Amino acid sequence: MRSAKNWTNSVRGDVYRLKRPRSAQGHEQQGERYAVVVQANAYEHLSTWLVAPTTTKSFGSMIHPTIELRGQDVRVLVEQTTAVDPQRLGDFAGRLSPGELIEINVALRAVLDLE
């Protein structure tokens, strides 16, 4: 498994363990989970990355595409996309398939009204 310390080889669609937030409030995701990098590869040099958290508790929908992660179906919460310092990212957990990345793109376009 690749460490998050090697960010220069990271690409859109990579999945990392997300370290627990210290002060999640309201409906913000808490606890241990994963995050999908949704930021364009051309901007990986920035000090923060755009990531979308995952959950096993939400129902699949157009804005919660389902991906397979370590043999389990999880949903990507694209409406909760946020900027994080790459140092908040833990271990590399995998990479989305091309089909999964297309579903993420569709969900992001819907949530951001980019159609």
Question: Which residues does each predicted region cover?
Answer:
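Conserved functional hotspots at enzyme active or ligand-binding sites that engage polyanionic ligands
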Residues: 1-115
